[in-house]
Amino acid sequence: MATLKEKLMTPVAAASAVPSSKITVVGVGQVGMACAVSILGKGLCDELALVDVLEDKLKGEMMDLQHGSLFLQTHKIVADKDYAVTANSKIVVVTAGVRQQEGESRLNLVQRNVGVFKGIIPQIVKYSPNCTILVVSNPVDILTYVTWKLSGLPKHRVIGSGCNLDTARFRYLMAERLGIHPTSCHGWILGEHGDSSVAVWSGVNVAGVSLQELNPAMGTDKDSENWKEVHKQVVESAYEVIRLKGYTNWAIGLSVAELCETMLKNLCRVHSVSTLVKGTYGIENDVFLSLPCVLSASGLTSVINQKLKDDEVAQLKKSADTLWSIQKDLKDM
């Protein structure tokens, strides 16, 4: 007796069992779900997998997204605490970890999160050995280093979301003061995602016009217009949002979706993301910091050799020293 489906359809060829643009999000907290929704909203993947240890919440989030499938271009959304569900992922976004508390420095989080990552990273590599891992959990630069060490993957396939969001915040705040759209204001935040990030004032421009040439004091304490306040706002913005709503999620979710889009579509766009910087700008230790990097289908394929002023290089080295002072004491690696 033929089933309804057999009466409805005549098979012609076997459907592909392997997804071509699968993305996994590890961790279904506020940040993880913002990443998932932003990725789905862009229609980037043919399959989305979610992983978490909280089974009820995980199943609930999966079902909630599945029920919206009619409005999406991703027809397959799966979830499980077993990492087998992540098999054949092109990109794995890691958002899991203990959450930052109000007023807590990102660096204070690190040792608490190392233990969490030991249960995550080897499982990712087991089921998706050819994936690129995008680390979002804070403190992101050190946890990207931890991921690189635990995964055994080449450095171009372990990337931290880094200062991509800091750069977006910077461009937004600069553009607000200038009365233009953020896409028309070009500037970069490098170094550590967080307290010791570096604003590259020498490179800020609008339509190729250097703002520091118009105002040589820009970014210094001698600036009567106090543009340095913009970078201070960038550094403090996450803490402010956490104070107001308890966490940050939407901006980082949108930032992560853009990074995934650049890699999946092989767009070769330049992003400020965390990468191994040993050997650049006189940095001697195995630390991950954000530099302008070209992302493609292969992962991180090039680093832009940005011309920095001496004080900017000094700040970058200070960022590296800040991170290394924590990293060198990490245990169970």
Swiss-Prot record:
Pathway: Fermentation; pyruvate fermentation to lactate; (S)-lactate from pyruvate: step 1/1. Gene3D superfamilies: Lactate dehydrogenase/glycoside hydrolase, family 4, C-terminal, NAD(P)-binding Rossmann-like Domain. The keyword Cytoplasm applies. GO terms for molecular function: L-lactate dehydrogenase activity; structural constituent of eye lens. One of its GO terms (biological process) is lactate metabolic process. CDD domains: LDH_1. The keyword Ribosomal protein does not apply. Its main location: cytoplasm. One of its GO terms (cellular component) is cytoplasm. It comes from the Eukaryota. Its EC number is 1.1.1.27. Keywords: Cytoplasm, Eye lens protein, NAD, Oxidoreductase. It catalyses: (S)-lactate + NAD(+) = pyruvate + NADH + H(+). The active site is at residue 193. It is found in: Cytoplasm. Substrate binds at residues 106, 138, 169, 248. NAD(+) binds at residues 29-57, 99, 138. InterPro entries: L-lactate/malate_DH, L-lactate_DH, L-lactate_DH_AS, Lactate/malate_DH_C, Lactate/malate_DH_N, Lactate_DH/Glyco_Ohase_4_C, NAD(P)-bd_dom_sf. It holds the Pfam family Ldh_1_N. Belongs to the LDH/MDH superfamily. LDH family. NCBIfam families: L-LDH-NAD. Interconverts simultaneously and stereospecifically pyruvate and lactate with concomitant interconversion of NADH and NAD(+). Homotetramer. This is L-lactate dehydrogenase B chain. It comes from Anas platyrhynchos. The lineage of its organism: Eukaryota, Metazoa, Chordata, Craniata, Vertebrata.
